[in-house]
Amino acid sequence: MMSISLLGGIVTAVCCCLWLLLGMRRRQTGEPPLENGIIPYLGCALQFGANPLEFLRANQRKHGHIFTCQLMGNYVHFITNPLSYHKVLCHGKYLDWKKFHFTASAKAFGHRSIDPSDGNTTDNINKTIIKTLQGDALNLLAAAMMENLQLVLRPQVAPQPEKPAWVTEGMYSFCYRVMFEAGYVTLFGKDPIGHDAQKALILNNLDNFKQFDKIFPALVAGFPIHVFKTGHYAREKLAEGLRLQKLRKRDHISELVRFLNDTLSTLDDAEKAKSLLAVLWASQANTIPATFWCLFQTIRSPEAMKAASEEVNKTLEKAGQKISLDDKPIYLNQIELDSMPVLDSIIKESLRLSSASLNIRTAKEDFTLHLQDGSYNIRKDDIIALYPQLMHLDPEIYPDPLTFKYDRYLDENGKTKTTFYSHGLKLKYYYMPFGSGATICPGRLFAVQEIKQFLILMLSYFDLELVESHVKCPPLDQSRAGLGILPPSNDIEFRYKLKHL
């Protein structure tokens, strides 16, 4: 009698053969080169997930600047020539950026669709977010973040500021703790329950956030959250803390959160809270590793440390601000923060080396895509993808691309450099850690400002040094490739000590 395992093997083999004969997509005339992969449905997903950059480079060498890969049942057209990026964006009427992003958000955070076309919101949620993250609203948010960062950092100097001692800590852990607490209370307000209780609440939320963030890549990939018991529990606890009855007890809630609660008026309280959890994740998941890389690269480079410290001191002096341990926090306005080209260059260079975002748009109909390298037919529901890390690490655009150069984004006059070339042609898009076009991160201005504020305070309050002065740069954690800024695969110990103010 045929064994069950043998029968199962035969059935699997037959199914694979049927897929190869009937279900496998075939390249049509005028379409980009096609890679189906050898595993039904998964296609090339395993190879791409293992090392996206090398996978795309290999296919670029094999097929040229555009090719199609099957990934988890989707057909993705990768555009790898940065000279064609702006041409992709010119086809906006054929492309839908919302479908993928809103679907991924609903999967990961557990709320109903927040796409306005589905009727669950009273307004375009993306417009609401943009409106509350620019202009006067951004100024208020940045001022609150600057104050909260100082409230979080000041306990580091206690209890004997007259006899400062070195404190050793993991740099990523330090950045995670400081940025999470300051960012959380900036957006969602302070609970008037006393300092110790507030600190305990934040630490609990921090632990839950880490647990949830661990499983986030799997959720976006389509795995059900019930598979991850600890991560699922963490998500529900985080969302519970963002319910309306909890928020009403807090002081100084941001305009962003208040406006979103109004915009999501058709959702019940539980789903509103899960939508706000999406805001929490978006405000922390990339900012925290970005902050680490900026601080690490600055401390590691004596030239960067010297140039940054000089710029910070000059800016504070010009603004009439003095670092002290009294109750008066320092404050820099929008114009002053925007007039710091050295810090801007350090942040850009750090993000260039650590970002691995995937810019995605879905074809709304069959159409012809006209690029720098030719024209290609695209089918409805196919995905157009840009992977800017290819550009960020291109030696023709960025000589010696793996080396941190703090002044890479400064011109000969010390001003912001905006001119970069590929094959002798000026690039319109040369720096894309925050996406592009309609998919550009609406919180990018605030993210850069809070990182800049953190660096200003760290350089002003503390003497800083690495425990191992010649430590190697930690590898990037590739498990988050496609989601934004990659964290370090291991922490780096550093020491900080209060300056004699």
UniProtKB/Swiss-Prot annotation:
One of its GO terms (molecular function) is heme binding. GO terms for cellular component: endoplasmic reticulum membrane; intracellular membrane-bounded organelle. The chain crosses the membrane at residues 4-24. It is a single-pass membrane protein. GO terms for biological process: bile acid biosynthetic process; cellular response to cholesterol; cellular response to glucose stimulus; cholesterol catabolic process; cholesterol homeostasis; regulation of bile acid biosynthetic process. It comes from the Eukaryota. Its cofactor is heme. InterPro entries: Cholesterol_7a_monooxygenase, CYP450_sterol_14alpha_dmase, Cyt_P450, Cyt_P450_CS, Cyt_P450_CYP7A1-type, Cyt_P450_E_grp-IV, Cyt_P450_sf. Its EC number is 1.14.14.26, 1.14.14.23. It is found in: Endoplasmic reticulum membrane; Microsome membrane. Belongs to the cytochrome P450 family. A cytochrome P450 monooxygenase involved in the metabolism of endogenous cholesterol and its oxygenated derivatives (oxysterols). Mechanistically, uses molecular oxygen inserting one oxygen atom into a substrate, and reducing the second into a water molecule, with two electrons provided by NADPH via cytochrome P450 reductase (CPR; NADPH-ferrihemoprotein reductase). Functions as a critical regulatory enzyme of bile acid biosynthesis and cholesterol homeostasis. This is Cytochrome P450 7A1. It comes from Sus scrofa.
